């Protein structure tokens, strides 16, 4: 996690492994390109190779020719200090990226690395509609797993299509690894009626626990990824997943009611993937601004949310700086109307705060 020293990161790794967990997920761009090196220092140097499973991903948007696959892959092995990846993915595939990967030989590259023993299991992470996923899995039966955005809020969403994508994978007999089970942290922070509904089930259970268990309860899910920023989150996650219990009927019904309540709130369904940030000519930290926007919707315009907004625009562009070029919208896996939403954020915060 950004800003944490290696000593703390090692504590998190140790706590996780001591409790019997072993899967670590990284990728080329995570944490400004430093995540894989951190994995090398804090995990790989300190544990025998059979103590952990390591996944990383090919940054397909950087690939211009077949040789680039080799270049980035070798760089990733070196950064992580491993001779092979247990799981390796083509990163953030959608309709356009899959065509590029097919034209440049991305799928063949994964198969060749598997044949050489440098990858144990090949797959891809996916951000698009279910019909695109169906086409990919039909054309590429060699794919052993798919990583999908699944959470109870997006299950019936026409934007994300969690359920439809899950059912496509199930139809093809391809196991699912879940990402975004807590929807970028959104489902870990409940107030009002949603908070009351979940607290009534068990006042000691975290809101995040219901979201992660929801995803883990699906039969074709082999693994649920959950981003953990500190030891407290890690200890909470590992406590309820060590002795995993699928959701009961009562819990499923409660989650249904929570979704009904959440849908009444006009929050922005941003997952903080940050693909929109890279090409922004005004250096606007779009997901961070949307995060504060959502805080305002959920908790009101308070000193905390105002302070958070000031913090997010410190040293970078504010929402009102947007020139509406649309580069961000072309990158957004959630297909959000970012330009319009930035205008709304500027209206709420910048006018009120005279920025």
Predicted regions and their residues:
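Alpha-helix-loop-beta-strand connector modules within alpha/beta enzyme cores
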Residues: 37-56, 109-112, 116, 171
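Structured C-terminal cap/extension of enzyme domains
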Residues: 12-22, 41, 164-355
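Hydrophobic residues in well-ordered beta-strands that form the structural core
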Residues: 25-26, 56, 178
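Glycine/proline-rich, positively charged
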Residues: 14, 18, 61-182, 189-196, ...
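Short catalytic-loop micro-motif centered on adjacent basic/acidic residues
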Residues: 23-30, 120-124, 147, 223-225
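Structural motif corresponding to the early beta-alpha repeats
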Residues: 30, 46-67, 91
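Short, small-residue-biased leader/transition segments that mark boundaries at the very start
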Residues: 1-8
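Glycine-rich, proline-tolerant flexible connector loops at the mouths of alpha/beta enzymes
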Residues: 23-43, 94-98
């Amino acid at each position: 996690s950004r800003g944490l020293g290696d000593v703390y990161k090692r504590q998190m790794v140790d706590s996780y492994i001591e409790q019997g967990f072993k899967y670590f997920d990284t990728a080329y761009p995570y944490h400004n390109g430093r995540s894989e090196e951190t994995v090398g220092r804090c995990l790989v140097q300190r544990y025998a190779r059979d103590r952990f499973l390591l996944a990383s991903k090919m940054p397909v948007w950087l690939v211009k020719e077949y040789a680039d696959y080799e270049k980035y892959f070798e760089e990733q092995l070196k950064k992580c200090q491993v001779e092979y990846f247990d799981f390796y993915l083509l990163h953030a595939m959608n309709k356009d990226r899959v065509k590029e990967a097919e034209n440049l030989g991305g799928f063949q590259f994964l198969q060749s690395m598997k044949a050489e023993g440098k990858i144990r299991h090949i797959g891809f992470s996916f951000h698009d509609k279910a019909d695109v996923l169906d086409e990919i899995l039909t054309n590429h039966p060699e794919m052993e797993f798919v990583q999908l955005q699944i959470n109870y809020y997006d299950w019936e969403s026409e934007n994300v299509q969690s359920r439809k994508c899950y059912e496509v994978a199930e139809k093809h007999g391809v196991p699912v690894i879940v990402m975004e089970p807590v929807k970028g942290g959104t489902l870990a922070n409940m107030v009002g009626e949603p908070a009351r509904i979940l607290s009534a089930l068990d006042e000691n259970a975290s809101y995040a626990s219901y979201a992660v268990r929801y995803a883990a309860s699906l039969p074709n899910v082999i693994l649920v990824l959950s981003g953990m920023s500190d030891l407290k989150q890690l200890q909470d996650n590992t406590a309820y997943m060590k002795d995993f219990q699928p959701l009961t009927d009562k819990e499923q019904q409660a989650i249904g009611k929570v979704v009904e309540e959440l849908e009444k709130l006009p929050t922005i369904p941003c997952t903080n993937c940050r693909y929109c940030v890279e090409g922004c000519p005004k250096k606007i930290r779009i997901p961070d601004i949307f995060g504060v926007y959502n805080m305002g919707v959920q908790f009101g315009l308070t000193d905390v949310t105002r302070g958070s907004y000031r913090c997010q625009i410190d040293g970078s562009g504010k929402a009102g700086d947007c020139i509406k070029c649309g580069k961000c919208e072309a990158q957004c896996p959630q297909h959000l109307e970012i330009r319009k939403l930035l205008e709304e954020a500027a209206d709420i915060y910048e006018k009120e705060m005279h920025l």
